[in-house]
Curated annotation (Swiss-Prot):
Family: Belongs to the universal ribosomal protein uL1 family.
Cellular-component GO terms for this entry: large ribosomal subunit
Biological role: Binds directly to 23S rRNA. The L1 stalk is quite mobile in the ribosome, and is involved in E site tRNA release. Protein L1 is also a translational repressor protein, it controls the translation of the L11 operon by binding to its mRNA.
Organism lineage string: Bacteria, Pseudomonadati, Chlamydiota, Chlamydiia, Chlamydiales
Protein name listed in UniProt: Large ribosomal subunit protein uL1
GO biological process, one term: regulation of translation
Natural source organism: Chlamydia trachomatis serovar L2b (strain UCH-1/proctitis)
Ribonucleoprotein found in the keyword field: yes
Quaternary state and interactors: Part of the 50S ribosomal subunit.
CDD domains: Ribosomal_L1 (cd00403)
Keyword terms of this UniProt record: Repressor, Ribonucleoprotein, Ribosomal protein, RNA-binding, rRNA-binding, Translation regulation, tRNA-binding
Listed Pfam families: Ribosomal_L1
Length: 232
């Protein structure tokens, strides 16, 4: 058996695949798994009780995680004039207007989040086919279309993230690094869950948090009891 196979078998022996755990227990399971040579990301995958085909059941928003994600973001800002100068001063990694639009049209997407001033959206909107599938398109709902670029950049640096349900009604979000202590991971997950519940469409019927799984990059996916999360 390969080292990879032995590691997976060892992981599976630490918990019951058919069981749902409390959030604290699930985090403990991830922490107990064999280590790897890099700091793994803690991801959550949430199946929502929505019909994503309906325009009034789209789930998208943002939340400031109390302990950040542990990831150093590469922030791009579409802006011109004074707002571009403000973005540069605030520490954005890439700042520009038409030049960045053309660069992205050519296939460059070497950044993690994009912010735009409202006056830039006419041109930025032309990048929908490139940015949309990568969840990089600035939107007012996510707070990434703004006149206050300084505040937005600061919030992103501190741990503000965007979440969006895909075509299957699933939200996949990185919420922490496995090196965070258990309480920090738990508080970040709870903040995300509270934001998801707040974003529940009024027309969504039945159970909203259908399935919730937490995992690490090289670790298992552990099912979390949604009854605990709904009560947050």
């Amino acid at each position: 058996m390969t080292k990879h196979g032995k590691r997976i078998r060892g992981i599976q022996e630490t918990y019951d695949l058919a069981k749902s755990y409390s959030l604290g227990e699930a985090i403990d399971i991830l922490k107990q798994c064999p280590t790897v040579r890099f700091d793994q990301t803690v991801d959550v995958s949430v199946k929502l009780g929505i019909d994503p085909r309906k325009s009034d059941q789209q789930v998208r928003g943002s939340v400031s995680l109390p302990h950040g994600t542990g990831k150093v973001l590469r922030i791009l800002v579409f802006a011109a004039g004074d707002k571009a100068a403000e973005a540069i001063e605030a520490g954005a990694d890439f700042v520009g207007s038409d030049d960045l639009v053309e660069k992205i049209k050519g296939g460059w997407v070497d950044f993690d989040v994009a912010v735009a001033t409202p006056d830039m959206m006419r041109e930025v909107g032309k990048l929908g086919k490139v940015l949309g599938p990568r969840n990089l398109m600035p939107t007012p709902k996510a707070g990434t279309v703004t006149t206050d670029v300084v505040k937005t950049i600061a919030e992103l640096r501190k741990g503000k993230i965007e979440f969006k349900a895909d075509r299957a009604g699933v939200c996949n979000v990185g919420v922490a690094k496995l090196s965070f202590d258990s309480a920090q991971i738990k508080e970040n997950v709870e903040a995300l869950c509270a934001a998801l519940v707040k974003a529940k469409p009024a027309t969504a019927k039945g159970q909203y948090l259908v399935n919730f799984t937490i995992s690490s990059t090289m670790g298992p996916g552990v099912t979390v009891d949604t009854r605990e999360l709904i009560a947050l």
